[in-house]
Amino acid sequence: NESTMEANMDAAFNYLKNIDSESEEMPAVAQSKGTSLYCLENTMEAKAQQLGFTTKVVVKAKYTPYGLNENSSYFSWKGNYYTLDQLKTEYLKHSDGSGLKVDLPIFLKKAGIMTQEQFDGDQDTKNSVVASLSEGATATQLNAKTGIIGRFCAVRYYHESVCYYDVLIRHDQNVTEKMALGRYGVVRNNWYHLELQSVSGPGTPWIPDPSDPDNP
């Protein structure tokens, strides 16, 4: 049975998945310090060394851009970062049918905060939803699930500065050429040690899982 085989392979590889609704539980990203994990061997052709095929580690961390309060929630849009109040102010600067007046409603609808009826309504309806945005635990408020459910949009929401980074596992450190055979992968009877020394910017507010529509 092909579907059973696929389910067994998914379980064996144990990859993290995003959620699509408020009713789903947040995926646990946790590992005790100093412990190790076993994973299946995973090698591929050079041209196949991409996010959807390469074994990696997902790092959950908090990154707050300069100028914002540490561990606070914020939005990103076109390379800029905003608190909720700043985003509302920026939103009002844009003409109807352009900029944030387009991108923010798209994000809010994807995240489940704006209903389809509100999204299809007039500009005043959308403006009202934006004006009433707040943080909280309900489905229509900004919370820990919002950024994950509303993934792949121009507007991103980082709840309490939480973000995710994916770190591809390098098999051969001596292979310096990008996409060269053996650069990435997991080979049996090998021990891999990953050390994260620094980050230069926020990751994604969603878990970078194999369904991401991006190459490395």
Predicted regions and their residues:
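Substrate-binding/catalytic groove segments of enzymes
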Residues: 200-207
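C-terminal functional modules
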Residues: 183, 188, 210-216
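Tryptophan-paired
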Residues: 1-198
